[in-house]
């Protein structure tokens, strides 16, 4: 005879608050989860406020420019890609060169790409 959901609900309904607390802790340990409440996202604020809070940025290669070989070298150094993969990335511009990086690192990458003759931007 299998235990049904109704049987479980009846058993839980008869527990005290302390027993329920122990039950929740047992579930957390058994299944490796947390019963903490999930924070619900509030309404969207002003765009400027959201931009200030952004901590991860994507560096986008907009155009390779005239010095394609130099840009490929910089892309290889930044990403660790092989020659063919870096060439494909540069040829396929606009493409993301690096994703989820800190602002300072993103600015440094854009500077390197720009010095090599490419057009790059931070998003």
From Swiss-Prot:
Keywords, ordered alphabetically: Ribonucleoprotein, Ribosomal protein
Keyword Cell membrane: no
Domain of life, per lineage: Bacteria
Disulfide-linked positions: none
One Pfam family in the UniProt entry: Ribosomal_L12_N
GO biological process: translation
Keyword Plastid part of the UniProt annotation: no
GO CC terms: cytosolic large ribosomal subunit
InterPro entries reported for this sequence: Ribosomal_bL12, Ribosomal_bL12_C, Ribosomal_bL12_C/ClpS-like, Ribosomal_bL12_oligo, Ribosomal_bL12_oligo_N_sf
An annotated Gene Ontology molecular function: mRNA binding
PANTHER family per UniProt: 39S RIBOSOMAL PROTEIN L12, LARGE RIBOSOMAL SUBUNIT PROTEIN BL12M
Subunit structure: Homodimer. Part of the ribosomal stalk of the 50S ribosomal subunit. Forms a multimeric L10(L12)X complex, where L10 forms an elongated spine to which 2 to 4 L12 dimers bind in a sequential fashion. Binds GTP-bound translation factors.
Function according to Swiss-Prot or TrEMBL: Forms part of the ribosomal stalk which helps the ribosome interact with GTP-bound translation factors. Is thus essential for accurate translation.
NCBIfam families: L12
This protein's name: Large ribosomal subunit protein bL12
Annotated organism of origin: Chromobacterium violaceum (strain ATCC 12472 / DSM 30191 / JCM 1249 / CCUG 213 / NBRC 12614 / NCIMB 9131 / NCTC 9757 / MK)
